[in-house]
């Protein structure tokens, strides 16, 4: 299986597209190597439980994973930012790279605003796309509010609740796609 800080070939025809690899991904040489990856694996438990035929594995690296920008970007790496600019993402050679890396995938899940910059190009390539927030803790916290009865739960339990909501958002979007 092919790995780099921004790409995992996987063997299932579902792809997850994130923004850009960071310091952790550069160090480990695999995409979504930190908390986002742990959150993705927790979400796969929910996705597999609800749609075991579609999400047939609980392991993130069984799926295609790429990023809207290939080069690691992080403040910890000396950059003043942690994501590429939209102009960088939309450069023809970058769009072509992403489309090439998505070859063989029918369903593409765009995780976060930077991944969504590629939605038109990916949709025009004939793939089904689902758009959800980034599964990093910041993305989960900003998008999925928790009800009052869960506010006193541990931070781990609140995170698990938000991860379940993220997985449900994917399942609802798939159901809407299938209804059309």
Q: Model-derived features: where do they sit?
A:
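A general structural motif
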Residues: 11-12, 104-106, 126
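A short acidic (Asp/Glu
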Residues: 26-29, 75-77, 118-122, 142
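A structural motif corresponding to the C-terminal end of an alpha-helix
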Residues: 47-50, 58, 98-106, 173-179
């Amino acid at each position: 299986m092919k790995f780099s800080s921004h790409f995992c070939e996987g063997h299932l025809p579902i792809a997850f597209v994130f923004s850009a690899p960071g310091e952790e991904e550069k160090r480990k040489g695999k995409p979504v190597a930190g908390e986002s990856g742990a959150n993705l694996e927790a979400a796969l438990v929910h996705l597999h439980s609800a749609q075991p035929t579609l999400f047939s594995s609980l392991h993130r690296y069984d799926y295609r994973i790429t990023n809207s920008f290939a080069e690691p970007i992080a403040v910890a790496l000396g950059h003043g930012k942690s994501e590429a600019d939209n102009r960088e993402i939309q450069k023809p050679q970058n769009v072509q790279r992403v489309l090439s890396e998505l070859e063989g995938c029918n369903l593409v899940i765009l995780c976060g605003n930077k991944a969504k910059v590629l939605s038109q190009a990916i949709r025009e390539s004939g793939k089904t796309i689902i758009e959800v927030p980034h599964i990093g803790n910041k993305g989960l916290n900003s998008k999925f509010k928790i009800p009052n009865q869960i506010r006193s739960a541990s931070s781990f339990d609140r995170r698990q609740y938000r991860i379940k909501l993220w997985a449900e958002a994917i399942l609802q979007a798939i159901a809407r796609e299938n209804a059309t």
